[in-house]
């Protein structure tokens, strides 16, 4: 909150990663565990009081980044019921296994991991475990990702914006280049976002990951514009120093793509 106030931020949305099933994140490494949801809400409420004191003109909004996976609708509705903003994201591809028990809950130790090698499922943005890339190759990951992303757009979940739409670009500078037919995949994504009336996020996080372009890449952003898809702009900050990172430049970039 203090960092956002210092940057002159007008709208700050808290979007920590929502609770996940034990099958996907058994060690609770990338989520707010179900047991911690009340404490997380309390921490936000305390921060909102601070925001009202030091930045009364800033809108501070409670939300979550909600990972889409097959069958997630009930879980997301339950765990994100207090969220004013829900970012939709697709960092996982493939089946998610038994999603009935949240990570850290009683009985979670009996749940088999859904990302075991050979299952063609797992996280596509986790640099410490690249087995899904090694199993499917870049072409396979991209194909599965676009299918999953479109399924997320088509889901009944009320995602307010689809975060970092071309997330597989994450490792494009590390030997996993986008496939030669990526433009046809972009066409699919733009058409799907239009047909499902979804917004997409223009994210500056990619620049902090060493990529030469934003999420989404310029070619995809231009397709979203031509398809009449609205955008939000965010920094996806995980630490205070990244709050509002590159936002003004991203606004200019969106303007160059046609957005007003």
Regions inferred by a protein language model and the residue ranges of each:
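An N-terminally biased module of ancient metal coordination in phosphate/nucleic-acid-related enzymes
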Residues: 1-70, 75, 171-173, 177-180, ...
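Feature marks short, surface-exposed loop/turn motifs that line or immediately flank catalytic pockets
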Residues: 18-21, 94-96, 169-171, 206-208
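Short hydrophobic "helix-edge" motifs at membrane interfaces and signal-peptide entry regions
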Residues: 6, 154-155, 225-228
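Charged catalytic cores and adjacent phosphate/nucleic-acid-binding surfaces used
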Residues: 2, 172-260
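A structural motif
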Residues: 9, 83, 157-159, 229, ...
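Active-site neighborhood of phospho(di)ester-bond hydrolases with catalytic His/Asp-centered motifs
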Residues: 11-16, 61-65, 87-90, 160-163, ...
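Extended substrate/RNA-proximal surfaces in nucleic-acid metabolism proteins
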Residues: 35-195
């Amino acid at each position: 909150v203090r960092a956002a106030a210092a940057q002159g931020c007008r709208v700050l949305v808290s979007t920590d990663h929502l609770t996940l099933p034990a099958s996907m994140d058994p060690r609770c490494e990338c989520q707010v565990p179900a047991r911690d949801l009340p404490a997380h809400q309390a921490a936000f409420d305390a921060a909102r009081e601070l925001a009202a004191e030091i930045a009364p003109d800033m809108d501070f909004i409670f939300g979550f980044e909600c990972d889409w996976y097959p069958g997630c609708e009930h879980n997301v509705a339950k765990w994100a019921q207090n969220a004013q903003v829900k970012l939709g994201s697709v960092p996982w591809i493939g089946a998610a296994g038994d999603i009935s028990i949240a990570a850290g809950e009683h009985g979670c130790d009996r749940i088999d991991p859904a990302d075991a090698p050979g299952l063609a499922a797992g996280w596509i943005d986790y640099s410490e475990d690249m087995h899904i890339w090694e199993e499917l190759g870049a072409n396979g990951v991209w194909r599965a990702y676009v299918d999953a992303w479109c399924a997320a757009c088509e889901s009944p979940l009320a995602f307010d914006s689809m975060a970092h739409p071309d997330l597989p670009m994450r490792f494009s500078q590390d030997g996993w280049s986008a496939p030669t037919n990526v433009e046809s995949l972009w066409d699919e994504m733009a058409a799907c976002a239009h047909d499902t009336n979804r917004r997409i996020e223009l994210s500056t996080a990619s620049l902090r990951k060493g990529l030469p372009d934003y999420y989404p890449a310029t070619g995809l952003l231009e397709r979203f514009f031509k398809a009449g898809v609205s955008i939000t702009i965010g920094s996806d900050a995980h630490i205070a120093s990244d709050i509002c990172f590159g936002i003004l430049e991203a606004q200019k970039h969106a303007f160059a793509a046609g957005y007003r």
